[in-house]
């Protein structure tokens, strides 16, 4: 019956700009805060899916005068894996995604490999990429 008539999928409530800014304002300057700030602002500014965010590597970034250009090598909407480019401009406020990403990469000394990585309970940044599930948990924890 469900297949014949269809049912709406349960979706999470969207995170609106003002809500995001409120979450960002609660963050400090710890390594974890810097990572989460960069992740949330980049995801929002670029309209990235979780899987796209965790799949980004340093080599995917091109710095241009107006900000950054990311090359997405594959995504849910790019089944042929042709890739696409997404531009992220500099912002004019403390919510600038480019500045937040640069602060995270510098603080974590990331020069290559995955952009967004787990941080151990001892404050060490690992070499692996965050998982999509970790991004969901991070967001849930920050929004609550």
List the predicted regions and their residue ranges.
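Conserved catalytic core of the tyrosine transesterase superfamily
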Residues: 1-144
């Amino acid at each position: 019956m469900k297949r014949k008539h269809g049912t709406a999928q349960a979706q999470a409530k969207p995170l609106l700009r003002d809500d995001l800014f409120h979450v960002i304002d609660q963050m400090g300057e710890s390594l974890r805060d810097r990572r989460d700030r960069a992740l949330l602002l980049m995801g929002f500014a670029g309209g990235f899916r979780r899987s796209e965010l965790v799949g980004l590597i340093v080599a995917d970034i091109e710095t241009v005068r107006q900000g950054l250009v990311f090359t997405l090598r594959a995504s849910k909407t790019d089944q042929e894996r042709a890739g696409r480019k997404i531009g992220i401009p500099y912002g004019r406020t403390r919510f600038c995604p480019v500045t937040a990403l640069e602060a995270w990469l510098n603080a974590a000394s990331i020069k290559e490999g995955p952009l967004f990585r787990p941080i151990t309970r001892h404050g060490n940044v690992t070499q692996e990429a965050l998982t999509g599930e970790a991004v969901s948990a991070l967001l849930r924890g920050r929004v609550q």
